Amino acid sequence: MNPNVFRNLSYGVYVVSSLDGDRNTGCIANSIMQITSSPATIALSMNHDNYTNSCIARTGKFAISILSETSDPGLIGCFGFRTGRDVNKFDDIDYTVKEGLPICRLIDKMETSTHTVFLGEVIDGDVIGSDPAMTYSYYHKVVKGKSPKNAPTYLPQEDEPASGSGAKWVCSVCGYVYDGDTYTCPICHQGKDKFRKTGNS
């Protein structure tokens, strides 16, 4: 089977958040869909290894923020390539809390071998801004990002060095490409030790 067939499915790019005690936590997700309009119900797929998964299961609450094409790539790095077990991802961003935090109330879940599919009833929501929503395709083709290993759309060949002329440095964590040899990744904030050289020198 050609695993790239899944790249033809339509996905968005979202920040999914919940509570860890009194602290907000969250991660990037791309597998979210509306199930019904009345009552408004959302389905969300999340890897068992994501810390946010256990927080949603524990609190029964979660929120979804739809990222736009103009979203700062650093937001994806912060929420997609670091774990809420180790850092407070909300420390350096502006955010709004509704209903204490959640806009969705967990109503059911289904387990697979690697992921949980959560069903949530939408309690509240709002549209902020008019920029186009970021799709998974846009993230790969324009932002040039790669999927974290916990993403349902992760493909191992994303870790392979890109071919082409000229030496480039690629962040092994998030896939960001840089033409120099001393750098800190603006997406996932990793240092030069996480970059590997690709192409011809």
Q: Predicted segment positions?
A:
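Basic, polyanion-binding surface patches
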Residues: M1-Y178
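Extracellular/surface recognition and adhesion modules
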Residues: Y178-D179, C185
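Intrinsically disordered, low-complexity terminal tails and linkers in eukaryotic proteins, enriched
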Residues: N200-S201
